[in-house]
């Protein structure tokens, strides 16, 4: 983006910041509770034929060099989406900093133009929520078991006791490689088992990056996330989804983190891509 484009984006005389799209068929459009938006802005709903955009009025986009400020805005954005979910049911979350120029008239035009798709998406997600499942693994119990039962590892260990220094070094490398191979296989099996466990209950499943750390003092530092899934499922199946995880959670060294329900952040389509009214 050029400096001129950046300046044009930053200057809005009548912008609408959009948090999400909701089904207003059975709920009055003004019923957003006491929720306040980014920078304590008043949140309201602009609705067309039972499809509403949850918005606040703005005169600029939300762009800052201060990453902590951006994070605070993002947290508030998500909080608004979570709050209105309690009122309207499953929403279609919008990307952070989705701003339409042109006031309510431009926004209602967009809602009318995209109404068939929005209606279809809202109906498709109705009653379904996103759950997040993380499998954390402490390999020590597995390593203790495999070193005592793996024939190859035991043979390599026995040979080390009788070998000279040079040969011992090579045998140790072979031992470590074999143990790493068994460890990788176990990680892969656990990840596959997790996917298989949630599949019968899930409407959709998406794998997520495991590098984001989970801060939980109740989990040993030896535990590392080896699989993280976003699961879209009906809220009525929440208990069934949790039950599907019980067998895996009972395995040695395994801890399961199961959170939700959340709005379908992972699964909602990016409806506003290349929209002409978007700032």
Curated annotation (Swiss-Prot):
Extract one GO BP annotation from the record. gas vesicle organization
GO CC, alphabetical: gas vesicle
Against InterPro entries, the record matches this protein to: Gas_vesic_GvpL, GvpL/GvpF
| Keyword Disulfide bond in annotation | no
Q: Which domain of life is it from?
A: Archaea
Alphabetical keyword list: Gas vesicle, Plasmid
Taking the first listed entry, what is the main subcellular location of this protein, grouped into a coarse class? other
Per the entry, what induces it? In PHH4 (a deletion of the p-vac locus) transcribed in all growth phases, maximal expression in mid-stationary phase. An unstable 6kb transcript able to cover gvpD-gvpE-gvpF-gvpG-gvpH-gvpI-gvpJ-gvpK-gvpL-gvpM is detected, as well as smaller transcripts. Gas vesicles appear earlier when grown in static culture, possibly due to O(2)-limitation.
Indicate the secretion signal residues: none
Q: Where in the cell is it found?
A: Gas vesicle
Subunit structure of this chain's protein: GvpF to GvpM interact with each other in vitro, and may form multi-subunit complex(es). Interacts with GvpC, GvpN and GvpO.
Q: What does this protein do?
A: Proteins GvpF to GvpM might be involved in nucleating gas vesicle formation. A minor component of the gas vesicle. Gas vesicles are hollow, gas filled proteinaceous nanostructures found in several microbial planktonic microorganisms. They allow positioning of halobacteria at the optimal depth for growth in the poorly aerated, shallow brine pools of their habitat. Expression of 2 c-vac DNA fragments containing 2 divergently transcribed regions (gvpE-gvpF-gvpG-gvpH-gvpI-gvpJ-gvpK-gvpL-gvpM and gvpA-gvpC-gvpN-gvpO) allows H.volcanii to produce gas vesicles.
Leftover remarks:
Encoded in a 14-gene locus called c-vac which produces cylindrical gas vesicles only in the stationary growth phase.
Which family does the entry's similarity section mention? Belongs to the gas vesicle GvpF/GvpL family.
Name by which UniProt lists this protein: Gas vesicle protein L2
User: Which gene specifies this protein's sequence?
Assistant: gvpL2
């Amino acid at each position: 983006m050029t400096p001129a484009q950046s300046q044009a984006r930053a200057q809005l005389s009548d912008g609408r910041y959009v948090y999400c799209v909701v089904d207003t068929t059975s709920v009055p459009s003004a019923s957003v509770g006491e929720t306040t938006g980014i920078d304590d802005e008043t949140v309201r709903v602009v609705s067309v034929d039972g499809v509403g955009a949850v918005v606040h009025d703005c005169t600029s986009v939300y762009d800052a060099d201060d990453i902590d400020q951006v994070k605070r805005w993002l947290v508030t954005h998500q909080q608004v989406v979570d709050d209105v979910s309690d009122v309207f049911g499953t929403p279609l979350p919008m990307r952070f900093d989705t701003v339409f120029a042109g006031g309510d008239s431009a926004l209602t035009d967009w809602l009318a133009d995209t109404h068939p798709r929005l209606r279809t998406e809202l109906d498709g997600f109705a009653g379904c929520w996103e759950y997040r499942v993380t499998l954390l693994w402490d390999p020590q119990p597995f390593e203790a078991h495999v070193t005592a039962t793996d024939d190859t590892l035991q043979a390599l260990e026995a040979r080390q006791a009788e070998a000279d220094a040079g040969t011992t070094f090579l045998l140790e490398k072979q031992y470590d490689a074999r143990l790493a191979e068994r460890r990788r296989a176990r990680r892969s099996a656990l990840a596959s088992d997790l996917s298989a466990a949630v599949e019968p209950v899930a409407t959709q499943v998406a794998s997520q990056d495991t590098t984001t750390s989970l801060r939980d003092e109740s989990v040993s530092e030896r535990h590392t996330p080896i699989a993280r899934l976003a699961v879209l499922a009906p809220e009525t199946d929440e208990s069934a989804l949790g039950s599907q995880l019980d067998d895996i959670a009972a395995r040695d060294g395994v801890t399961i983190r199961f959170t939700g329900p959340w709005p379908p952040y992972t699964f909602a389509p990016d409806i506003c891509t290349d929209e002409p009214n978007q700032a």
